[in-house]
């Protein structure tokens, strides 16, 4: 657990990301894929039910012993809250109401944010669009770890701690890599979230509030679903920047595992990404992919060739249009 990883820097590349070229090729060959570029109204009802489910859980845990509060937060609440962050990912791509009702998606994202306990839906949308446009761009893509993360988390034990602390790194990394001025929507998101948290504490008590926050922190840290954070873009095979996952946890995560398909077609809702793979099978079936996020987490910690430095990175090119 104490041996150091062999990598001491990111994988600097001087080619463009592969997704734009593959998208053009696939659309030229299979123009029917354009019919999948439409919102998924089922998202609305699924998310409403998820919020109501967590509200019910808040009520149930208010009188439980603390050990059951924490157990419930990890065994149940973490799955709901991590899934909700991926619902917010869908909303960030306007998958709920479509591009023509962009603001409806922003308000709905704030609603979906409520049971997570920490305001982030508006900020996530801003940074996530940069991640798609400028994948791996130095100083722009905040999905890339900082140099400190790559330098410090360089043993199996430290990488294990890094996995546990993932939600904190995702929360604070943008402040160091690509800080942005606060927008009025972020202020509204924060006020709405803090008000909701206060109401939960006032009407249901401290145990419900702790359950909500613990569900988010535990669910985004050392949790099977959190394998997607590493599986998506960490370079387990040299030269491959994005990886898909085709295992059963896609059922809980709005098909976020179909990540090559998602980066090729970010305006297609997760529900339809398996159809993209089916239609253009020759483009995806031979790409390296995963069937277990748990194995991804294990390999990340135990493999001495993999670390937070295992990301492909690019220097900025020309003038960038940021969110």
Curated annotation (Swiss-Prot):
Changing residue 280 to V: In HLD18; decreased function in sphingolipid biosynthetic process; reduced protein levels; increased protein degradation. A motif (Histidine box-3) lies at residues 259-263. It holds the Pfam family Lipid_DES. A motif (Histidine box-1) lies at residues 89-93. Its EC number is 1.14.19.17, 5.2.1.-. Keywords: Disease variant, Endoplasmic reticulum, Fatty acid biosynthesis, Fatty acid metabolism, Isomerase, Leukodystrophy, Lipid biosynthesis, Lipid metabolism, Lipoprotein, Membrane, Mitochondrion, Myristate, Oxidoreductase, Phosphoprotein, Transmembrane, Transmembrane helix. Has sphingolipid-delta-4-desaturase activity. Converts D-erythro-sphinganine to D-erythro-sphingosine (E-sphing-4-enine). Catalyzes the equilibrium isomerization of retinols. This is Sphingolipid delta(4)-desaturase DES1. It comes from Homo sapiens (Human). The lineage of its organism: Eukaryota, Metazoa, Chordata, Craniata, Vertebrata.
């Amino acid at each position: 657990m104490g041996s150091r990883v062999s990598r001491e820097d990111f994988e600097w590349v001087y080619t463009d990301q592969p997704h734009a070229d593959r998208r053009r090729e696939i659309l030229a060959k299979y123009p029917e894929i354009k019919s999948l570029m439409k919102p998924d109204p089922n998202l609305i009802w699924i998310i409403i039910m998820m919020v109501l489910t967590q509200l019910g859980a808040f009520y149930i845990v208010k009188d439980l012993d603390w050990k059951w509060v924490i157990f419930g937060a990890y065994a149940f609440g973490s799955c709901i809250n991590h899934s909700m962050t991926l619902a917010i990912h869908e909303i960030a791509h306007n998958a709920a109401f479509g591009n023509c009702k962009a603001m409806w998606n922003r308000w709905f994202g704030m609603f979906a944010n409520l049971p997570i306990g920490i305001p982030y839906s508006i900020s996530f949308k801003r940074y996530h669009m940069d991640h798609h446009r400028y994948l791996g761009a130095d100083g722009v893509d905040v999905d890339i770890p900082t140099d400190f993360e790559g330098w410090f988390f360089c043993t199996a034990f430290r990488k294990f701690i890094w996995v546990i602390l993932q939600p904190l790194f995702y929360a604070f990394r943008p402040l160091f890599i690509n800080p942005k001025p606060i927008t009025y929507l972020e202020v509204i998101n924060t006020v709405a979230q803090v008000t909701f948290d206060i109401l939960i504490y006032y009407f249901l008590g401290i145990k419900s509030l702790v359950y909500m926050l613990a569900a988010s922190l535990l669910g985004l840290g050392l949790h099977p679903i959190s394998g997607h954070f590493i599986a998506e873009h960490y370079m387990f095979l040299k030269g491959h920047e994005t990886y898909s996952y085709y295992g059963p946890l896609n059922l809980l995560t709005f098909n976020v595992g179909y990540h090559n398909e998602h980066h090729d077609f970010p305006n297609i809702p997760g529900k339809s990404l398996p159809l993209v793979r089916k239609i253009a099978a020759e483009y995806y079936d031979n790409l390296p992919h995963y069937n277990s996020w748990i194995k991804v987490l294990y390999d990340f910690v135990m493999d001495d060739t993999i670390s937070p430095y295992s990301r492909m990175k690019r220097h900025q090119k020309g003038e960038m249009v940021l969110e």
